[in-house]
């Protein structure tokens, strides 16, 4: 006997899953986005040991605070997130490896970052590819060759690294050097600048940018003199730390190592540590895997690049390089945000102790 069907019973069961699953997915995405937003407001302090077997006792446990790719970001009022985190940290010098300005060229956040350290430890910095040119002819003010943000940073106590700077520790020394000086043929560069200077002087005196160009050339000649003097002063026992924005590739390192300039030239093989940035840790990272993609401008461009070539410590052709995960967001990536990638700064501790 067939059961009668109630007039009030639906012919088909409701498919509640068709609504629940999309809602759960939307909720999950909202939670991830919210957590990522909070995470990007934090700053993580990393610690790395760098082994230099010939390190002197004076430099054992010498610490360098490495910061990169600020991109004009401010973490708390007056960079209070960073200053609070570092309140009990110990370090002997601060190295900033470029991309310090905001996309619009403003640099207030950079100056506030310098103020966290200035007067306590030396602060060295180089410019990045997304910063305004640090040195350029100023037609309206020919006596100036440095960009406004460089001059302002120097007024706040930082040191623009256009030539080697010596930091003496006991009877030992650490030299902080611009990477651009390695492989530089000083004699040839000086000859080229002097020829250019002579050509400008022989031009008509009413050239509007003549004075500005001459000022830049004189500045570059003075930089060559300072590099040359520093190279002559450097001892084999000194530690050389090279600052660069773009990480050095294996090809670049091989080329610089093969450099056979005159005795007054600097050699990359004398460098104990290279500090770099630029990649922002890949910007978007896959948990437990690494960077999702390298920027198109990188030699290792592509999906899931080798992670120690994007961030962290590595040794290439005998050269130790540390690439900072950075703080901000680079225009080199199509997605303008950090994902699963906490903004980070690093304290690198020099040691003679081998670790296995």
Which positions does each model-derived feature cover?
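N-terminal Lys/Arg-rich, disordered targeting/topogenic segments
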Residues: 1-17
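Acidic, His/Gly-rich catalytic cores of divalent-metal-dependent hydrolytic chemistry
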Residues: 8-10, 24-31, 35-46, 307-311, ...
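N-terminal active-site segment of His-dependent metallophosphoesterases
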Residues: 28-113
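Beta-strand-turn-beta hairpins that frame and shape the catalytic cleft
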Residues: 51-65, 164-178, 192-202, 232-241, ...
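Active-site neighborhood of phospho(di)ester-bond hydrolases with catalytic His/Asp-centered motifs
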Residues: 66-68, 93-99, 123-129, 161-163, ...
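Core catalytic region of metal-dependent phosphoesterases/phosphodiesterases
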Residues: 79-169, 267
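Binuclear metal-dependent hydrolase catalytic cores centered on His/Asp/Glu-rich metal-binding motifs
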Residues: 135, 155-157, 170-243, 250-264, ...
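Conserved beta-sheet core of the metallophosphoesterase superfamily
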Residues: 248-343
